[in-house]
């Protein structure tokens, strides 16, 4: 969806996007708290790992989206960027343009962060990011408190300067609905 959006910025381009699954019309896709109801349905590939020796040879279920927007239409909507060290390692291996400092401007350009304003986040981009205060519960607050009491530092912005620590989750939600890559990048250019 992101690539289709970017390619469509040039009016000389005609873009065809093929999706293996169907449209993202299933009601549970739009309702943030209903995401688990999408597992093992027609919008899920239903992948499993090979038998895993460390868990008594069980196969581990891997839900993956099979609908417009892919897994961004079926996952738990947590917005977590890759770790700085991973991007820098890719660049060190010869992948020019993939260092953290080189990809950060693209994260910023894509993002519309509702709460955080600093040099690591964007405003006005197509991908909405929020703390989704409706999901803030006493249990979530107790979890963060327990982590801090056990030596894990609180990190109010794990998509910022430092990723380590405990935090409430940043979500891809807008107006109390899932904000998938299809909603953010594809539907605006259809």
Question: Which residues does each PLM region occupy?
Answer:
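N-terminal redox-cofactor-binding region of secreted/periplasmic oxidoreductases
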Residues: 1-190
